Amino acid sequence: MHSATAAIAALGVSPLIRIRGTHSDLIKRALDAGAYGIVVLQIHTAAEAGVVVSSSKFPSLGMRGQGLVFPAFIHGIDIPTYIRSANDTLITCVQIESVEGVRNVDAICAVPGVDMVFIGPNDLALSLLGYVPARGDEPEFQRAIENIVAAARRHGKWVGRLSNDGKASKIHLNVFDTVALSYDVRAMHN
């Protein structure tokens, strides 16, 4: 992970690491490896979002320990400077992709330290509709997306989503702050 984050950052791209669940040790490991942020999947409640923030931020915003010096080293700064700047510069993103997450999205977005909310449309469709992918025109799916975007905007959070193709991503960029296009596995397969 250390080599990958350094290589990605060297290209001028901000490496984010996806983490399944609110495991403090995995969040710390990703950030200690030099990730510029984390995306934590399957967040359903404000309490879970709070655990993510607490694990990813240094005191007084969280409980993250100093750990390795690698992030400071790759950023070319000393450790105290890295620690002072990390809470403001590293992205803490939670992914909403369930009916429960949509139901609690306003409370999730109200958690201080959550910087971005990302929509996982395929798992959201599976949870909401019982199938994937969503066609995109299902009223309940559209309402869920609109509710997530509205909550993020109300609380001053960035909001992003996955797009399954280039045409959709261009449309999504009119609404979302960031769009991930497809998956690396699909890109390699094609």
State the predicted function of each range.
Residues 15-19, 38-40, 92-97, 117-119, ...:
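Hydrophobic faces of well-ordered beta-strands that scaffold small-molecule active sites
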Residues 25, 37-112, 121-126:
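Conserved anion-binding
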Residues 23, 64-78, 96-99, 129, ...:
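C-terminal alpha-helical cap/extension of soluble enzyme domains
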Residues 1-24, 28-32, 54-62, 84-87, ...:
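Alpha-helix-loop-beta-strand connector modules within alpha/beta enzyme cores
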Residues 32-37, 57-58, 110-116, 173-179:
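Glycine-enriched alpha-helix->loop->beta-strand junction motifs that scaffold or abut catalytic
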Residues 20-21, 43-45, 121-123, 164-165, ...:
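Short, ordered loop/turn segments at secondary-structure junctions
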Residues 29, 107, 170-172:
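Well-formed, non-transmembrane alpha-helical positions, independent of function
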Residues 1, 48-51, 127-129, 188-190:
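Short, charged, surface-exposed secondary-structure boundary motifs
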